């Protein structure tokens, strides 16, 4: 994984996030809070363990994982998922599976920004972060 991912990132733009949350099955009240949140994402690495911490006024979440190894995750909207994150062509690709459903979250670096692309049932959400 590129060390360029490491550090603190702040959300600067979000496109289609409400539709993505709807596709996930997130309720109206939680979607409203999620749309208002402007999270910071802190990515760190210790040995071969990567940690992604998301902090916002809505909720803080943290996942720690090894690339290519499945782990259990409780998401900000309280889904209990089996997740796996791999590194492909410089991008961190995450697959979350729960209740027979699946979503993908791809994190890639473009022009010094972290572009996060979330896909669920044909809905695509793009969130862009800048390094703090």
Swiss-Prot record:
Disulfide bonds: none annotated. Belongs to the calycin superfamily. Fatty-acid binding protein (FABP) family. PROSITE patterns: FABP. Hexadecanoate binds at residues 107, 127-129. One of its GO terms (biological process) is membrane organization. The keyword Cytoplasm applies. One of its GO terms (molecular function) is cholesterol binding. It comes from Oryctolagus cuniculus (Rabbit). P2 protein and myelin basic protein together constitute a major fraction of peripheral nervous system myelin protein. (9Z)-octadecenoate binds at residues 107, 127-129. One of its GO terms (cellular component) is myelin sheath. PANTHER family: FATTY ACID BINDING PROTEIN. It is found in: Cytoplasm. May play a role in lipid transport protein in Schwann cells. May bind cholesterol. It comes from the Eukaryota. Forms a beta-barrel structure that accommodates hydrophobic ligands in its interior. The keyword Cell wall biogenesis/degradation does not apply. The modification N-acetylserine is found at residue 2. Pfam families: Lipocalin. Monomer. Keywords: Acetylation, Cytoplasm, Lipid-binding, Transport. This is Myelin P2 protein.
């Amino acid at each position: 994984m590129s060390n360029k991912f490491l550090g603190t990132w702040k959300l600067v733009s979000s496109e289609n996030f409400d539709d993505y949350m709807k596709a996930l099955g997130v309720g109206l009240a939680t979607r409203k809070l999620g749309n208002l949140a402007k999270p910071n994402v802190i990515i760190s690495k210790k040995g071969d363990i990567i940690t992604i911490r998301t902090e916002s006024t809505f909720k803080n979440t943290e996942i720690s994982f090894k690339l290519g190894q499945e782990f259990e995750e409780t998401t900000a909207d309280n889904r209990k998922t089996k997740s796996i994150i791999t590194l492909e062509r410089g991008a961190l690709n995450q697959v979350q599976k729960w209740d027979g459903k699946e979503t993908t979250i791809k994190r890639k670096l473009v022009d010094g920004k972290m572009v996060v692309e979330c896909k669920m049932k044909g809905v695509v959400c793009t969130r862009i972060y800048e390094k703090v």
